[in-house]
Amino acid sequence: MSMKRKKIVIGIVVFVVLATVSLLIANTIAKNKLKDYIVNLPEHITIVYDDLDVSLLQGNITLKAPLLTVKGKTTNQVNAQVKLANLDIKGFGYWSYLFNDKLKFEALNFETPLVTYYHNPLADTDQGSQSVLKNIKKALYIKNLNVNEASVKVINVENDSIIFSTNNLNFLMTQISINDDLDIKTLFKFKSSTVSANNLKYQV
């Protein structure tokens, strides 16, 4: 092998090694930033999960077996819980997040979520919804939000009765955005939505 060819081979090897190391470092930085964001949610909102997978090249993130719990700010009682098989995020805009502090996703997929909401007639549910979304504290854009095969149960806390339930619920919402331009009464904007479900039960 000639000296010129050796230099070319060495240069290629060095480039591949540097690119791989840089990718691993960037991947670790992005993963740690996401972990910090989850840890630093408001006290009444918690997310626990089994594992967090990040693929920088594909822009994909998977939270394995996450459990979201939302409590009342004053009562400290559980208002809602969402348990999923997986939360899959596709096409995450890392550079928008790292440098512009903006959350941007091509798709957000909730796989087989089990949703339990504890309805309190005396509570201000609209205020609670605003609290969760406003606490995101970042500009947010989601091209497609998919909920696949969800089970939903709404429980009346006054008598522990089930006032609403359904299973195999599928939901799609497109072009969702949250930013500082929205007025206080508007939680978010979206373009379209579709929903289907089985075994819908409602207590009048």
Predicted regions and their residues:
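N-terminal type II signal-anchor transmembrane helix
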Residues: S2-E43
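Sec-dependent signal peptide cleavage junction
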Residues: A30-N40, D124-T125, S129-I136
